[in-house]
Each structure stands twice: as C-alpha cells, then as structure tokens.
From Swiss-Prot:
This is Cation/H(+) antiporter 10. The lineage of its organism: Eukaryota, Viridiplantae, Streptophyta, Embryophyta, Tracheophyta. The chain crosses the membrane at residues 31-51, 61-81, 100-120, 135-155, 175-195, 206-226, 244-264, 276-295, 300-322, 356-376, 389-409, 418-438. GO terms for cellular component: membrane. It comes from Arabidopsis thaliana (Mouse-ear cress). Its main location: membrane. May operate as a cation/H(+) antiporter. Pfam families: CHX17_2nd, CHX17_C, Na_H_Exchanger. Belongs to the monovalent cation:proton antiporter 2 (CPA2) transporter (TC 2.A.37) family. CHX (TC 2.A.37.4) subfamily.
Length: 783
C-alpha cells in the first residue's frame, strides 16, 4: 500500500468494533480478535511489553531506549511472532480492511505529530546565526553524497531479473543514495540530547548544519514528488500539483502566519494560550497532511511547513509542547517506530543477500562520502580533529526518523523488502554503536580543563576581578547585588567586571540560545523580571561610581544542561569565580521554606566541571536586606571567614581580603586549630603563609584575626553554631583536610554535600541563626 494513502484508510467500517469479551465464546476465545478494538488493544499491549523487556536489558549496557523500540519491532516481526501477518486476516468480516489498518493509522499519526512538534520546537534562527561553517557543512553534506548516483550503474549486468527488473533495480539504488544522503533533524537532535551536548558549541554547530540540510531536503522532496508524478502519472497532474504547492505556501505565509502572530500578540504574558487556538493549530497540521496526500506528495510535508511557521517557545510553542509532547513521545512515537521495525524481515536479507549486496556497499559508500563531506569544512575552519570527527558522526547518524523515508520508498515499491529490512537493521546498529563511539571520542568536559590558574588566590594584587553570577528567580537579584556590594568600593584599587547570566528553562523549543542584553531582545518586555533585574544592576553600577562594570546575558537552556552555558560563558569571559544561588529558600523570618532540587543538581554539575573557582550563596534574607539598608545608612555588615585549612579555605580568604577596602563591612577571620595538626604538612605550610599578614598587627589593620583550639568534631559543631550568631555573612571553603577524623565523622550527617561539612552546618534547617553563607571551591585542576 502506498504511504501517501495511509490517511485515506479512515473509512466506514462494516465490522464490529467491540466484542463481548473472552467469556462470550469459551470454546474459541480467540474469536474476540475478530473485532477491531480488542485486536488493536492486544497489539499495543504486545508492543509496550516487548519495549519494556528489551529496555530492561539494554539500559544495563548503556543502549538508548530508541533501540528498544526497534528491537521490540523486530521481535514482533516475521522473525519471531509475525504479529502483522497474524493480525492481517483476523477482521475477515471486511477483507478490504485488514487487522493492521488501525495500528497503521496510529503509527502514521504518531509520525505526523512527532514531526510537527519537533519542527515547532526548532529555532529557524539557529541556521543562519552561527557563522559560515554550519552553512558550508549543511550545503556540502547535502550535495556531496549525491555523487553516489554515479555508482548506481556499477555491476548492473549482475542484477538478477527474478529479483527486480533492471530499470527498477537502478531506481532502487537511486532511492538508497537519496535516503542515505539526508540528515534529519529529529535524529540529530535526539543524539545530541542523549549525549547531553546540545548546549555545547559542537551541538549548536551540528544543529545549525542539520537545519540547513533539512531546508534543502524539503525542497528537493517536493521537486522529486512532482517529477515522479510528471513521469508516472501525467503532465497535467504534475502541473496541478505544482500549483497546489504554490497556493499552499502562499496561504501559509500570507494567511496562517499572520493569524498565528495575532494569537501570540493577544495572549497576555504569563497567561496560557486559549485551547481553541491550540486545537485549531493541530487541526490545521492534520489538514495540511491530507492536502499533500491529495496532491500526490508525502503527508509529512504539510506538518513540516506548518511547524516552521509557528514561533518556538512561549506562548504558543510551549503550549503545544505541554499539551501534546508527553502523549506523542511516550505513546504514539514508540508505536510508530515499533510498527516500522515490525516490517523488517531478517530472513529476506539472508535469502537475497547476493541481490542486495551492492545496495549494502552503496549504503556504506554514502556513509564514507558524508563523513568526509562533513569533516573537510570543519578541518578547513580549524576545528580540532576530535571535534570535527564528532560533528561528522553526529550528522551521519541514521535513526528512527529515517524510517519515514524508508517506508515511503518501500510502499512506493522503489526498494525491495530485503533492502528495507537491511536499512532498518542498519539504523538499529547506528542507535547502538554511534552514541558509544561519540562518548569515547568527544568528552565535553575536556574543553573546561584549564592549564592556567583561574581563581582569586593567584590573581595579581591590582588585577581585574572577573565574576560570573547566575540568576534563576527574582529573589536571586537582591542577594547577588548584596554580595557584589561587599567587593565594590569608591576607593577600589582594582576594577570588577561582572557578568550576569539569567537562566531560563527552555520550553517549547529545542535549540538553546544565549542572548546578550547589549542587543535588542524582542522576547522580553518591560514587565518581565529579567528587564527589572537589568535595571537593578544598572542602578548598582551607578552607585558604585563605575568601579564595577556589568554585562548581562540570558540563557534559554534545557534544565539538565544549564551548566554547559555557564561554563562556556565563564571560559569566554575568563572569569575567576562563578557565584550561584544554593536553591534553598527561606522565609522573611529566616525559616526554612523549600529546596530546589534542579538548582542543587546544577550546582553539583558546576562543581565537577567549572573552569574556575565557584561560590554557592545561601541567603537567609537578613544579609541582603541589611546590605540594601547599609547602602543608604551607616550600618556595618559583619563578615566572618571560618578557616580550617586547605585550598578552598585559602581561596575563601583571598576573596574576603578583597573586601577589606570597603568601609561598610567589618571582616573577621576565625581559624579553628586542631591540637594534633602536623606542622610539616604542605597544606599547613601554605595555610600559614596565607595567614601570615593577618597575624601581624602592624601589616594588618583592616581584618581581625582570631584563633580557637578545638579537639573534636563536637567542638567544631559548637564553634560553628556560636559563630553563626555573630555574623551577617560567613565565608567558608567547601573541602578541608578530610584525613582528619575530627571532620570526616561529620560527613555522615551532611544533608547538602555540595556545600561541604561546614557549609552544610551553617545552612542547616534547624539552625536558629539568620546568617547567610558563601561556600567557596577553588578551581579544580583536571588532567
């Protein structure tokens, strides 16, 4: 059956839909499968049972869930259960409709919805705003594999006429070249998300090149469909279809697009789009599929074009995602992929191996050509070899999205069942092998490895202090400005360069973007919290008498990949410290309110990857409020540094030393000394060197220095709790000398491991103090 006639399968049925159940006929209970609904239900149950069982084993070896969908289809195919063949004769009441028609309709609907939603979530700006390299890769990777058409006549004398007539066999080779030359956006996006590199520069490059390639592919698909109609149907029909496509484009761009913009404009900010408009968009996407089917083209082209028109992100794109993504991704897409794989017949590959051997050779030849076509521009533009190879493998990845093309050419009888089965198995091998190869080949954390010191301890005395601050919510603004006020001063000897990064969870789109607020940002209006925050930082710069410079950015990113944007920006701005909120929220009275798990996970990722030092700020409210009052009145803010020892404590001390010129704060360094410390230990020597200027009253007049002797972990806890009552802000290192039994015993009770032992004590829920905490970790040296 032709792919383009799937939507036409919805017709009046002349058989019963629902049965009376198994108990209606105990002698022949399988008669229940002569009814369409029970048959469909058992097919879906079998599909998801096989998916779950497959994934139980595959996830143990790190294989993605998409491979489980494919394997489930192969298990249910002719090799084992042959569900399609056994189902096709069940609805004998009406032989015109076999037992797989309903399942096929669900499969096509899943493909249609997935394609539409994926296109809606893809930013069209990413294709033309990433420089020349992705454009070159997209164009070269589209045209270069087509040189494989020059090999289609090789060994044509060996084609068995019993397998396929000569003309048709050559057409099969052409279909293989065209399908293998394509780079489909869903496949590229999926592997980037699976590898968690979609936020990286390499991920953005691959996405941009893929979008360029897809744009060329859409137009070539339309031209190919019209050409096929011109050759195989009639000239008049081809001309009619051409006019129909032109009319469709005009209606979409001149009518539908303005209507979509009108819906977006009339939807108030932070208000959902009315359901009426969402349903109208979905109906339009379905109608566009039927429109293209009627005019002899692939049904997938309609939803593609409608999806391109709809702007990604809120309000409409995010509303469509919220309403339909889970159902599509968790129900319809697995059925669609499994159904396509169920048509794979491995026995045909073996029995007709000699007939399809050249097709297999052609497939791998196109793979090599595509790898070279992607690799060459990357090397020409001086991309490292490992990253160039990674881009090439990503753009050569074949997966579930390609099933649409394979089914189309199979149903149009351009390829044989044996060739189709090989292409399905080839995609399965891709899904299992390519991600594993890429993980070994490209580690995104490698680019954060710094061979230069990027911390505060090793900064020259009067050199710039570069800080990157991250904001998640409106309440983060006041605490961040309060912290920066401690470092700023009218008589400052060193300038401070602050980069502010607003982190926004990506909804309704795939492509992460970082936007500079030096440029005009249309997506923000004057009522948004980001706009208000930017005004607050601008006022802070004016109050600091321009001793501080502030640059602001907004990162629209996936929640579990935000660390990529933060680390990349920190590298670009050569920052010495990243300051992030802790995720723990307090009431106005200083009582515990909630923990944000997503922010905590982000902070942990930053601690593992950050290319510089990092500070985690826990604000109980009093510190930020007092800082605001202090800027207007002559109140003093008490800052305490708890020093136990180790590189993180030395980094915290270096940070606080840069606050000593601020007349509005009073700094005290409290050193906890253990009675059994080894004075010959290297860390102990470095600690004393860092504290030497504080111990001398002649050299140090701005910072108070206190030493307290402790003998056990119990005394450490008591000392920390007492100190928390005396200061507005405590600055502590994250890690200390954990070989000491006095601290290692406390690790068992830590609730927030990202804050370390002392930071966790000061941020404890049951601590009655209102002290805020800054936990500092010095830049980690990795190899």
């Amino acid at each position: 059956m032709n792919t383009t006639t799937y939507i036409g399968d919805c017709r009046i049925s002349f058989f019963n839909i629902s049965s009376q159940g198994f108990w209606d006929n105990l002698k022949s209970p399988d008669v229940v499968f002569g009814y369409s609904l029970p048959l469909l239900e058992i097919q879906i149950i079998l599909i998801f049972f096989c998916i779950v069982m497959s994934h139980m084993f595959l996830r143990c070896i790190g294989i993605s869930q998409i491979a489980s969908y494919m394997i489930a289809g192969i298990v249910l195919g002719p090799q084992l259960f042959d569900v399609l063949e056994k189902s096709s004769g069940k609805l004998s009441v009406d032989p015109a409709l076999d037992g797989i028609a309903a399942l096929r309709c669900i499969s096509v609907f899943g493909t249609l919805m997935f394609t539409f939603l994926m296109t809606v979530r893809t930013s069209r700006r990413v294709a033309f705003h990433s420089g020349k390299l992705p454009v070159v890769i997209g164009i070269v990777s589209f045209f270069a594999p087509l040189f494989g058409l020059g090999f289609q006549n090789f060994f044509s004398d060996n084609i068995d006429p019993h397998y396929m007539p000569l003309t048709k066999a050559l057409g099969e080779r052409t279909a293989i070249v065209i399908t293998q030359s394509s780079i489909l956006l869903p496949s590229t996006t999926y592997i980037l998300l699976e590898l968690k590199i979609i936020n990286s520069e390499l991920g953005r490059l691959a996405l941009s090149a893929c979008v360029i390639n897809d744009i060329l592919g859409i137009f070539s698909m339309i031209v190919a469909s019209i050409q096929a109609t011109y050759i195989h149907v009639s000239h008049a029909t081809a001309y009619r279809d051409t006019v129909a496509v032109i009319i469709f484009f005009l209606v979409v761009f001149l009518v539908f697009k303005p209507m979509v913009q009108w819906v977006i404009d009339r939807t108030p900010e932070d208000k959902p789009v009315e359901d009426m408009y969402i349903h109208a968009v979905i109906i339009t996407a379905l109608a566009s599929a039927a429109y293209f089917v009627f005019f002899n083209m692939k049904y997938i082209l309609g939803p593609l074009m409608i999806g391109i028109i709809i702007p990604e992100g809120p309000p409409l794109g995010s509303a469509l995602e919220a309403k339909f993504e889970r159902l599509t991704m968790n129900v319809f897409l697995p059925i669609s992929i499994t159904f396509s794989a169920m048509r794979c017949d491995g026995a045909r590959i073996l029995s007709q191996f000699n007939d399809i051997f050249f097709n297999i050779f052609l497939t791998f030849l196109i793979l090599v050509i595509k790898l070279v076509a992607c690799l060459a521009p990357c090397l020409y533009y001086k991309l490292p070899l490992s990253e160039s190879l990674a881009v090439s493998f990503i753009l050569s990845y074949k997966s579930f999205a390609d099933f649409v093309l394979y089914e189309a050419v199979l149903d149009d009888t351009y390829i044989s069942q044996a060739t189709y089965s090989f292409l399905i198995l080839y995609s399965l091998l891709n899904a299992g092998i390519v991600p594993t190869v890429l993980r070994r080949m490209y580690d995104p954390r490698r680019k954060y490895v710094n061979y230069q010191k990027r911390d505060i301890l090793h900064l020259e005395r009067n050199s710039d202090l570069r800080i990157l601050t991250c904001l998640h919510k409106p309440e983060n603004v006041s605490e961040t400005i309060a912290f920066l006020q401690l470092l700023s001063s009218p008589n400052l000897d060193f300038p401070i360069a602050v980069t502010v990064l607003h982190l926004v969870k990506l909804v309704g789109q795939i492509n992460p973007i970082i936007v500079s607020h030096d440029k005009k940002l249309k997506r923000l209006n004057k009522d948004s919290y980001i706009h208000t925050a930017n005004l607050a930082f601008r006022q802070f710069v004016l109050e600091s008498l321009e001793s501080v410079t502030v640059t602001t950015f907004t990162a629209f990113s996936h929640e579990n990949l935000m660390h990529e944007d933060i680390c990349t920006l920190a590298l670009d701005k050569t920052t010495s410290m990243i300051v992030v909120p802790s995720g723990r929220k307090w009431t106005v009275d200083g009582l515990f309110e909630s923990d944000n798990t997503a922010i905590r996970h982000l902070n942990q990722s930053l601690l593992d990857r950050a290319p510089c030092s990092i500070g985690i700020l826990v604000d109980r409210g009093q510190f930020s409020r007092k800082s605001i009052v202090t800027s207007k009145k002559r109140y003093i803010i008490d800052v305490g540094v708890l020093f136990i020892g180790g590189k993180d404590d030395r980094e915290a001390l270096s940070l606080v030393k840069r606050m000593k010129n601020n007349p509005r704060i009073r700094v005290t360094v409290i050193r906890l000394v253990f009675d059994h410390e080894i004075e010959s230990d290297w860390d102990y020597i470095l600690d004393n060197e860092g504290l030497k200027d504080l111990k001398s009253t002649e050299d140090n007049k701005d910072i108070d220095y206190i030493e307290r002797i402790v003998t056990s972990s119990v005394e450490v806890v008591k000392a920390v709790q007492l100190l928390a009552e005396e200061y507005d802000l405590m600055v502590v290192g994250r890690d200390h000398d954990m070989t000491s039994q006095d601290l290692s015993g406390l690790m068992e009770w830590v609730e927030l491991p990202e804050l370390g032992v002392i930071g966790d004590l000061l941020a404890a829920r049951d601590l009655s103090s209102k002290v805020s905490v800054l936990v500092v970790q010095q830049q980690q040296q990795r190899t």
